[in-house]
């Protein structure tokens, strides 16, 4: 059974590389969308309960950002929480967690969010938060408990206030959906490993 912290540094390095590629793709998509297309791709975000908002919205939403500030804010949090997730998980688990959070969090947003176009990578960032907290809750090793405690200490209030008191057009639903998806993936992963 794979441990709470992957011992293979090559796997961790590959996970960091995967995160860097993901973040670079977000930058490229934003530059093309903003500078060349006048944000035309923004219409491909998640549009709740409409078939046109399910595909490609669930997959496209994390790559679309309303402004440079929106993108930069998400990249900073992704670098920290995604980096910690990469360190804890290693390559395979990190990629699996990322895909699960994007799909499950996006689907939950599509099912339950208010009308509008939900775009941005903050749902994924909240998913990494949920994944890290879930590692501490469900694995219960000293290292994962310390990581979960640190993440909760540094980001917990921000996460809580981002969901409870959203600003303007902030998609608190995507934040909550991402956090729940991250927690669910952490639980599912531990359950699957114990069944082996």
Regions found by a protein language model. Give the residues of each.
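A detector for small-residue-rich transmembrane helices and their helix-helix packing motifs
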Residues: 2-196
């Amino acid at each position: 059974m794979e441990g709470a912290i992957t011992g293979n540094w090559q796997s961790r390095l590959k996970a960091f590389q995967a995160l860097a590629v993901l973040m670079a793709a977000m930058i490229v998509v934003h530059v093309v969308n903003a500078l060349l297309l006048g944000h035309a791709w923004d219409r491909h975000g998640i549009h709740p309960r409409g078939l046109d908002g399910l595909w490609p919205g669930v997959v496209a939403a994390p790559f679309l950002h309303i402004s440079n500030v929106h993108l930069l804010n998400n990249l900073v949090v992704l670098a920290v929480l995604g980096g910690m997730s990469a360190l804890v998980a290693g390559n395979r688990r990190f990629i699996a967690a990322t895909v699960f959070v994007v799909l499950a969090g996006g689907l939950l947003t599509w099912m339950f969010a208010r009308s509008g176009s939900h775009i941005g990578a903050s749902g994924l960032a909240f998913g990494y938060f949920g994944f890290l907290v879930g590692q501490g809750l469900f694995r219960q090793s000293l290292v994962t408990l310390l990581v979960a405690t640190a993440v909760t200490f540094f980001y917990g209030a921000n996460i809580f206030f981002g969901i409870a008191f959203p600003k303007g057009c902030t998609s608190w639903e995507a934040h909550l959906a991402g956090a729940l998806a991250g927690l669910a993936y952490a639980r599912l992963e531990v359950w699957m490993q114990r069944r082996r």
